[in-house]
């Protein structure tokens, strides 16, 4: 199996981004959703992106943002990839001049394969836990057996991942990448350096 990529989401501080980069992370996530405790200002985001070394992907996370809001961020910030975590249609996700991934919240009865086909131009599909009224970052996991094999898009697995369970998750789902936020935090928005390093090490050793 190819090496599984890792993304640390909800980065709010330059020092946390650098710890992740030095540990070998593939991508960091910046949350542009004001209701999130991990939301960043444009000023914070600029400082974080400017500090990233080459080959670390900067991902911007949006939840039901308008096209103007997304465009306003992109005018100021060199994001590599967009992540849409709300009720966005394929049309909402496209036309920004950046590749995108679409988050789907998984629950029993969800036809994940069909949803993947809806977002046929997505670079990948992120699978997260379904919690009513909460678009993501819940710290809750979901039943990994609900993820079908052979999906038509690269799968980024999220939802309640941590050092304790990420190896098992990778063995069960065989994702393209894993995405963690709360599982490597000291408090919301502040990463724990040792947890970040340990998580990335577990992914590499899976």
UniProtKB/Swiss-Prot annotation:
Associated pathway: Amino-acid biosynthesis; L-tryptophan biosynthesis; L-tryptophan from chorismate: step 3/5
A Pfam family per the record: PRAI
HAMAP family reported in the protein's UniProt record: PRAI (MF_00135)
Catalysed reaction, written as an equation: N-(5-phospho-beta-D-ribosyl)anthranilate = 1-(2-carboxyphenylamino)-1-deoxy-D-ribulose 5-phosphate
Protein name: N-(5'-phosphoribosyl)anthranilate isomerase
Superkingdom in the source lineage: Bacteria
UniProt keyword annotations, A-Z: Amino-acid biosynthesis, Aromatic amino acid biosynthesis, Isomerase, Tryptophan biosynthesis
Family: Belongs to the TrpF family.
Enzyme Commission number: 5.3.1.24
Gene3D superfamilies: Aldolase class I (3.20.20.70)
UniProt organism field: Azotobacter vinelandii (strain DJ / ATCC BAA-1303)
Record carries keyword Iron: no
Gene: trpF
